Curated annotation (Swiss-Prot):
Domain of life of the native organism: Viruses
GO cellular component labels: host cell nucleus
Protein name: Transforming protein Myb
Single Gene Ontology MF annotation: RNA polymerase II cis-regulatory region sequence-specific DNA binding
SUPFAM superfamilies in alphabetical order: Homeodomain-like
Domain topic, free-text comment: The absence of the N- and/or C-terminal may prevent homodimer formation, leading to DNA-binding and its increased transactivation activity.
Entry-linked CDD domains: SANT
Location of the protein in the cell: Host nucleus
DNA-binding region, residue range(s): 44-67, 95-118
Domain Myb-like positions: 1-15
Transmembrane segments: none
Keyword terms: DNA-binding, Host nucleus, Oncogene, Repeat
Length: 382
């Protein structure tokens, strides 16, 4: 029941006593490598003719399993085991197709690895389930970013800022960051208060100051209200005098340097002179600032305006002194006049209020008008 070809193959490959079925020697391995380089990895019958007792099948298996430099001889990795599990579950013992999924591994190496270690695990525990690999946890972003923003670090509020129509900011800092030039000028060429809140983010500065005063000293509420009104009028005056540029703030004002403000407001403390109204207008040294009354949370445009707009405060102070001077002159004229007349229709200049006066003499305009009538009545002499 056997054909001639079958008998010939059986004799040449198995039964011939001249066949060498023992281990390969170094000389045989070297000949296989040399003839593979000469004939290529396909002509195994021609290569076997140069190896006594070896057939083409033996040379091919020796090359692909051991001598090929592209074959991996390292230990098996978990990723390769996972691929073998999945492929064997789908393909079974089709080692040649499984080996195509593993570059550098031969079908014989895959089969040996399966039979030696992996098959026992599958028989006892079954195929391992594919565990969903979660991505690495994202790094926390709660670190603080250092910034030199107008000489104080900004802590963003815990809640969202009020105002639903406002566009979200592109960065974590709601203040405009002004680049620091190389040369530090001696003066700040632009009002500090206008540089503070360029993006116009609402800052609860007045509320913070008022809350601080209310908690510690309730008697100062009146002073706080007056301070708020003064700040509002000062800010409106500054906005009306000079419009804020919208682009290229650093290029238009090269003399701006944020560290100068830092030195004047935080390092120097109370006795640091600050130039705040341009290169040609200089303000007097800023008065001492009670830092205990200004908490850290009130670091805002309002606070910087208190520190850097001292010239306007000085003007207001001068107006108050001028008003007191007018009152003193009024009192002097009242006491030195010999023609005092208490007629309710033509009242004399007096610092004492009279209940029957038709007009109040508390304003400079009314004082001037009353004083003019008085001079007309008495012939222009006082």
């Amino acid at each position: 029941n056997r054909t001639d070809v079958q008998c010939q193959h059986r004799w040449q490959k198995v039964l011939n006593p001249e066949l060498n079925k023992g281990p390969w020697t170094k000389e045989e391995d070297q000949r296989v490598i040399e003839h593979v380089q000469k004939y290529g990895p396909k002509r195994w019958s021609d290569i076997a003719k140069h190896l006594k007792g070896r057939i083409g099948k033996q040379c091919r298996e020796r090359w692909h399993n051991h001598l090929n430099p592209e074959v991996k001889k390292t230990s098996w990795t978990e990723e390769e085991d996972r691929i073998i599990y999945q492929a064997h579950k789908r393909l079974g013992n089709r080692w040649a197709e499984i080996a195509k999924l593993l570059p550098g591994r031969t079908d014989n190496a895959v089969k040996n690895h399966w039979n030696s270690t992996m098959r026992r695990k599958v028989e006892q525990e079954g195929y391992p389930q594919e565990s969903s690999k979660a991505g690495p946890p994202s790094a926390t972003t709660g670190f603080q970013k250092s910034s030199h923003l107008m000489a104080f670090a900004h802590n963003p509020p815990a809640g969202p800022l009020p105002g639903a129509g406002q566009a979200p900011l592109g960065s974590d800092y709601p203040y405009y960051h002004i680049a620091e030039p190389q040369n530090v000028p001696g003066q700040i060429p632009y009002p500090v208060a206008l540089h503070i809140n360029i993006i116009n983010v609402p800052q609860p500065a007045a509320a913070a100051i008022q809350r601080h005063y209310t908690d510690e000293d309730p008697e100062k509420e009146k002073r706080i209200k007056e301070l708020e009104l003064l700040l509002m009028s000062t800010e409106n005056e500054l906005k009306g005098q000079q419009a804020l540029p919208t682009q290229n703030h650093t290029a238009n004002y090269p003399g701006w340097h944020s560290t100068t403000v830092a030195d004047n407001t935080r390092t120097s403390g109370d006795n640091a002179p600050v130039s705040c109204l341009g290169e040609h207008h200089h303000c007097t040294p800023s008065p001492p600032v009670d830092h205990g009354c200004l908490p850290e949370e009130s670091a805002s445009p309002a606070r910087c305006m208190i520190v850097h707009q001292s010239n306007i405060l000085d003007n207001v102070k001068n107006l108050l002194e001028f008003a007191e001077t007018l009152q003193l002159i009024d009192s002097f004229l009242n006491t030195s006049s010999n023609h005092e007349n208490l007629n309710l229709d033509n009242p004399a200049l007096t610092s004492t209020p009279v209940c029957g006066h038709k007009m109040s003499v508390t304003t400079p305009f009314h004082k001037d008008q009353t004083f003019t009538e008085y001079r007309k009545m008495h012939g222009g002499a006082v």
